[in-house]
Amino acid sequence: MKLGIVIFPSKMIQDKANGLRKRYDPHYALVPPHITLKTPFETQDEQLESIVNELHTIASKTNPFTLHVGKVGSFAPVNNVIYFKVEKTPELTFLNEEMHSGFFTQEREYAFVPHLTIGQGLSDAEHADVLGRLRMKDFYYEQPIDRFHLLYQLENGTWTVHETFRLGKGNN
């Protein structure tokens, strides 16, 4: 089974991202806009309970925090992904580190850059054009975050929530 761990932003932020993703992200229909805490990973069904228990522990050690989303960035030239930048708070960093150490041993492919993808799979010319236009616009959003989600991938490639984890002591 394939799992991933994400934070979903507010509906307002998702709507803004989806307005762009419809045009620039081929994965638009597979998963709602999100901030990835742990990239998708394969696991055996019998490990799911242990993963859920570990995520409850991580959530209980993390205080709710404010998510700051603003400006447009890109991972070019590594890949042509365009995204809304997400401020790297101590809580986001802690969550990401906890999900890549101890119980979770998956190696990182890239350094942790919190972001909300709005375009990917673009040609070099399209990437440059879209990025140039979006960088001229003013984007800034903030919202309180008090939970993250364990997702699993269905056979048709879409992702759905398996369980939600509330941040802070006594919330799980």
UniProtKB/Swiss-Prot annotation:
Alphabetical UniProt keywords: Hydrolase
Active site: H34, H115
Enzyme Commission number(s) of this protein: 3.1.-.-
Domain of life where this protein originates: Bacteria
Keyword Iron (UniProt): no
Motif (HXTX 1): 34-37
A GO term, aspect molecular function: hydrolase activity, acting on ester bonds
Motif, HXTX 2: chain positions: 115-118
Entry's family note: Belongs to the 2H phosphoesterase superfamily. YjcG family.
PANTHER family in the record: PHOSPHOESTERASE SAOUHSC_00951-RELATED (PTHR40037:SF1), PHOSPHOESTERASE YJCG-RELATED (PTHR40037)
HAMAP family: 2H_phosphoesterase_YjcG
Name by which UniProt lists this protein: Putative phosphoesterase BALH_1087
Naturally occurring in which organism (per UniProt): Bacillus thuringiensis (strain Al Hakam)
Source organism phylogeny: Bacteria, Bacillati, Bacillota, Bacilli, Bacillales
